[in-house]
Amino acid sequence: MPDGFASHEERAAFIAGLPKAELHLHIEGSLEPELLFEFARRNRVAIPFASIDDVRAAYAFTNLQDFLDIYYQGMGVLHTEQDFFDLTAAYCARANADSVRHIEIFFDPQGHTARGVAFETVITGITRALDDAEARYGITSKLILCFLRHLSEAEAEATLDEALPFLGRIAGVGLDSSEVGHPPAKFERVFARARSLGLKTVAHAGEEGPPEYVREALDLLKVDRIDHGNRSLEDPALVARLAASDMTLTVCPLSNLKLCVVDDIADHPLKIMLDADLKATVNSDDPSYFGGYVNANYQAVADALDLSRDDLVTLARNSFTGSFLSDAEKARHLAAIDAYA
């Protein structure tokens, strides 16, 4: 039996109701095939799929770049403020069903402005849906603007310029897209500028890239959180540093499986991270492409790694303590976890 539970079913029910935050979610990565077809029809965009089954069959990846190729293709159906509203509203409904009480979501404006979609169109649609989710479900949110690392720092600077009128709705900046060959050092100046504007900073590092990329994210980008961070475990000194500094890692188990970062979910390093006192969290990354929202990720690692009640509570607590909420808001959520557990 799982430690702290009478059965696997009891653990699953515990996960379902456990209050949690999600800190690593790309809103464009929550585009379900049904919505893909709806937006394509709505905007008269041709897509290379005849059916929803065709789309799901295409969601077979061997690495990050395989996924990114189809991710950007899917993004092409998003044109209007209503599209971004509907996309975000659909994710928020799923998050609510998974007992998610706070979300910090990434958006990729460069993937839209390059297609002629205005920055304002993107952010207004997303924030309208986030406001609606707070009113409807009580879910609070933060928005993180991600720079695409396969593009230049100058292009990131231009995107930050476009964001200036909307800084009241943007909590931070991040770094995503193709990791290998695009080290954090490439974006040192634009991250410094973002910090000077009062924005939080996060970066994808150590997913496919080496531990050195995690060090660069810490030392050069001065990030508040590391997104993924799996390969940090290859460097004991880095692990010790991350643990000593209470650096949150936003880990994405089903993403790691789908992108072949791990060969089997039983090989996932999440439990090793917890045992090393790393502040790991569980997140869904791009759930429509990787086969599961946040509770499915919790369930997958709970089953494969035989996580205990204490492990699950730690993961949920980490998701709030690692968030960009105020200390008072964090305390309220931690009290809710304690009352539930």
From Swiss-Prot:
Q: Which cofactor does it need?
A: Zn(2+)
What superkingdom does the record give?
A: Bacteria
Gene3D superfamilies reported for this sequence: Metal-dependent hydrolases (3.20.20.140)
Task: Alphabetically list the UniProt keywords.
Answer: Hydrolase, Metal-binding, Nucleotide metabolism, Zinc
Known EC number: 3.5.4.2
Where along the chain is the active site annotated?
A: E207 (proton donor)
Question: What catalytic activity does the UniProt entry give for this protein?
Answer: adenine + H2O + H(+) = hypoxanthine + NH4(+)
Annotated Zn(2+) binding lies at H24, H26, H204, D285
Q: Show the coiled coil region(s).
A: none
Site location (Important for catalytic activity): H228
Molecular function in Gene Ontology: adenine deaminase activity; zinc ion binding
CDD domains in alphabetical order: ADA (cd01320)
Pfam entry (one): A_deaminase
A GO BP term here is: hypoxanthine salvage
Top EC class, one word: hydrolase
CC per GO annotation? cytosol
- Which family is this protein grouped under? Belongs to the metallo-dependent hydrolases superfamily. Adenosine and AMP deaminases family. Adenine deaminase type 2 subfamily.
Give the function comment from the record.
Answer: Catalyzes the hydrolytic deamination of adenine to hypoxanthine. Plays an important role in the purine salvage pathway and in nitrogen catabolism.
Name used for this protein in its record? Adenine deaminase
Annotated source species: Sphingopyxis alaskensis (strain DSM 13593 / LMG 18877 / RB2256)
